[in-house]
């Protein structure tokens, strides 16, 4: 029995209660195990908490089951229909029904879903059924406490608990409640048709209390409120009823508080179902409000099988007789009532059979049978036949579905009951009784209806208006809301964008800062810091470069080690051989200081030999010692003396060194260890007691340990010896110059250079001394030779190879600095050179000075001498690895030690640098391609983009420097010579005279030079002359127009001069540059500034001499024609302190090398060289050691001219040199194409940019040339005086020629020039009939290699003569072949053959060329073709002819040429027009139509090109018709104008064609040499200009075409 729990509001709890056992609940589904109704499960259920899977039967008010409530509805409905609504019983029943739905104070009524989920309980839920004759058969049944409708106890219950149970005050007192309950019970019994017991009747009337009678009331509903604990019933159970075995006996679990068995927890009234707690005693703490979705139980009459047995572990068995502590067994309160009743009816009526019990028993048995059958079916053997097994499976599944079907039916019934009940039906009005309507009511109803309608209409309108207002308001709100939202979003977006922008800016700043820091560390050569930053950035490319650098340097280090080891082994072998020979002879001849036997003719016979007195030990050295030649005679005269053994000084040292090296060689892989001297404890540099010797040790160690990029700690950490330290392992300190050097003291940086050169010698290495020009490379070389002679006892022979122009300078320097050194200047005529042979054979000399030419020519003499040292001045001459000089030196001359002197080691290309290194150290620098690829395209192998950014470029440059550092020493003037005055360079723009402007314009546009017509016997009428090499002609015009002889002759005649030479003012008025010089030179002479004036062209120097003579300037001239012996004299004359010569006129190529002209402080470069290094060399003739004044370099440049392009190209090349490398710019395999494009760009018209090309005025020029304020003021005064003087002159002329001064034949408009050009073309076609002058051919008749070879072998003139003969013979042969055929007999096929041939030579075209068309016809053709080419699509603006201009080559599109037999394009058509192949417009039309048909054949129909070709056909037809119509209407004059234009354009196209195709013509001239074709080269060799070269043309060509190679 359950009692109410006051704390938890009556949460039901399991407890022993009388009853027949658990009510079978609905199962969730079929179970494969035994059914709950089986014998097994019925026999042994154990009490415990219910399973969560079993539903709780919902209960009605006061604990009545829900089905009773539904039964109560039936009488209520019948009473309502009979009109008994006023009956008090009806109201009571209605109140009870309402309570079942819930009143105020009991929470809201349950929703239909809740009702549905609660379902309807089984009638077998409790043992106290109305018709049950026995109270209970449980383990402990006894008198119970009855409970009322609210779940409160009827008697003896705690009022407080009751108050808590109902959760609110009640209007009834206890007696009224008892009476009400009794009335309800009585109504139920009456509704079932059962008699009312007497005590119930009395309780209904309120006469007697109810509780004592409760056990005897069979229909009393089970209590619905649980007690505080599962206490036992107070009395023993009457043993008058017991179930048979297997139907629930003592082992059955006692029913729950509401007659619900354990496993089906009851539900408190008016609330949702409550779950059972998990443990047996934990229900006190269980929450009362936790909902649990429950499955509704089976309807009445369908008993469910008993719940399955709960395992003992999950629900411990509760003994039936246990009682809670503190709850004593209460005596039954019913005893007095029993006694009183027994007095009235002493014999109790026997109870009848309860049909419900019988039904229940029947159900149990059915369930048992079903469970048994399921078990049988489950245990069937697996060997059954297939059909039997199928039937058994069907039966088993059907039996398992029983509970599911029952549940489904129950849910259907529940839904039907709910939907048909009075209170829950949809239409409540259907149950009302209709009322009869009277007439008055109808009227009233009508009136009310009208009022209602009016009211409804008003309300509708009002509602509609409110609706509209609400819509409008909503629109406003909507807009406002979205405006605010948009504003917020915009603010947010702006904030986010600002945030990201700030973040990005910060990130960018940080990246820039890191990059700057990286660059700073890179430039500061902080390798460790730079590598750290690279690791932080994770830049793979930079890391890859560094890794490559390390690998390459490691390889080179190993190669250097091997080279040095090989040299040491060679030396040792030689010495052993020598010792063996001496031992074999048995006697030791007089040994010279170099360890070799001496004789009278020995080259060291005049050097002192150290001798020692045997007894006293006195040593005689220097002047006291005997000469090597008279040693034996001296020893005879001075007995007791003998030659001092070398072991005391050099020999022992060298032997020890050899032994040490021998020991060190086998262990090259060991980690580097410091030498013995360095292992000595070096004092702390910061301490005070550091002696001078210690300080020197510290500095030496620091100097040796520090490489260019690696600190020694890093090098040691990596286990690598520093690359530089390996190369210069043997160090020797040089503090002062040799005693043999007199007449001057070396500067400190020159001493350092000497030390580096000595280090190269000691380490068996060769190198490049690349100090900037003017730092004294010659002096340092002389210092090395004297040092080796004095300290190393190496007296030569030394071979010094120099340019002819500097040979006299070298001889002068030797005489000045080392007069004791015996030198031979090997030069002159063959007879003079032969005179030196005896001296050379005797070896009585130390140094031989000679030139490149004689090295090659006289190799049979010079190569026989075993040279100790080979020194090449201007070493960049060796930059071509295949040049004759390099090959001769490598193959014929024996010189283990080599030294190159150069001021420009890295000119333009990387292979050139490799060639120098390969010449010096062939064992280390073997492969050019590896070297070039490593520096040129480091990323070519990785697949990444090859272009390099600035940082990568600097890394590459630095790794190149790193490779070069042991072998190359380069110091700049600004670094080593602080006392050297600065050098300032200005580019001064010069204007053109009117004559220059006219000539320049026509030469640039048409490639023609205007003449006065005298060459055609049309003197005065004017004419044109087509010249080759347009750029060269443009440069000449910029320099001076009188460089063209016929122009000067014509002008001299025009101006009234005789002899064809212009003199006086008009010399400088004709040229802008000369006019500028005329303003500058007087000022420089007035302020005692000596001037070096460098020109490219010797003919210009001649004109300048005329000008100097006119102005009275004293000058000296040196060019390629100046003899070598005269050069020294010229230098001496100019450098004399009181020399009257203030201008030295030099050619850039001949006078730019190796001359000391430091007495001059102004350098004027009249015209720039293509190679900027030539100009730099020229500048450094003045800016060199010994210069006292600030040097001004004035570079003259004509505005808006080709000179500006040359200057730009030179600057670009210089930039390449400064950086050493820019990726991709070295690999100039396509240089011919680039050169062609560059020439074409120069020849095209460009817009004049006046602002940029401003010609400086007098004041600006004065600022450029003045060294200080006083000079500037003087120059300004001189300008003022000059202007005043000119103003006073009555015959005053402007400083530059103007157009009105020019003769009429030179002032021609473009049309006239075109006409004259066309006439000249015609004359060329038909022949002039008179002899023609020999034309100067400015193209190279020889290739670079051939020319260089000719220069080296001295056979230039013979080879050129041979080429000329071959040319003429070939021409004669061609003329004889062409003789029989005439233009008139040539056929169409011949035309095609001619058209396919390319013009193979310059000059006059072949005689068989077709006769020209009439100019008018040519004009028409050009006009038609131009119109077709220029036609554009009106919609897209696209030029249709773009793809038809030039066909792709056969290599690019071979399939086109396979398909199309006669390919033609507009370029070919234009060429045929120029060559007069078309004799009529019909011929032209055929080719244009063929072009379009070819396009239509090759391309798909409907493609863009196909459609374009159709359009072009129609365009051609329409243009032709239009032009023919115009032609008919035009007059004779217009025809003549067209003729002039046509001929002009023809000549223009011819000249451009000739200009652009220089490379092709060079190939053609190669063929003239008997068809010998040399393999093509990626980069052509730069020609060597011989200083003996006297031809002006060669000089000009070198400056023009030769310089294109740079």
Swiss-Prot record:
All residue ranges annotated as the QLQ domain in the record: 171-206
Keywords (A to Z) from UniProt: Acetylation, Activator, Bromodomain, Chromatin regulator, Hydrolase, Isopeptide bond, Neurogenesis, Nucleus, Phosphoprotein, Repressor, RNA-binding, Transcription, Transcription regulation, Ubl conjugation
Activity regulation, short description: Binding to RNAs including lncRNA Evf2 leads to inhibition of SMARCA4 ATPase and chromatin remodeling activities.
Residues that bear Phosphoserine: 602, 605, 687, 691, 1341, 1411, 1529, 1534, 1545, 1586, 1590
Regions of compositional bias (Basic and acidic residues) in chain numbering: 74-89, 1388-1397, 1559-1569
Modified residues (Phosphothreonine): 11, 345, 601, 1382
Annotated ranges, domain HSA: 452-524
EC class name: hydrolase
Cited Gene3D superfamilies: 1.20.5.170, 3.40.5.120, Bromodomain-like (1.20.920.10), P-loop containing nucleotide triphosphate hydrolases (3.40.50.300), Tandem AAA-ATPase domain (3.40.50.10810)
Domain of life per record: Eukaryota
One example of a Gene Ontology biological process annotation: positive regulation of transcription by RNA polymerase II
Modified residues (N6-acetyllysine): 188, 618
Pro residues biased stretches: 13-23, 231-241, 251-278, 294-319
Binding positions for ATP per the UniProt entry: 771-778
GO molecular function, one term: ATP binding
EC number(s) on file: 3.6.4.-
Coiled-coil zones: none
Domain Helicase C-terminal: 1076-1238
Binding partners and assembly: Component of the multiprotein chromatin-remodeling complexes SWI/SNF: SWI/SNF-A (BAF), SWI/SNF-B (PBAF) and related complexes. The canonical complex contains a catalytic subunit (either SMARCA4/BRG1/BAF190A or SMARCA2/BRM/BAF190B) and at least SMARCE1, ACTL6A/BAF53, SMARCC1/BAF155, SMARCC2/BAF170, and SMARCB1/SNF5/BAF47. Other subunits specific to each of the complexes may also be present permitting several possible developmental- and tissue-specific combinations.
Name of the molecule in the record: SWI/SNF-related matrix-associated actin-dependent regulator of chromatin subfamily A member 4
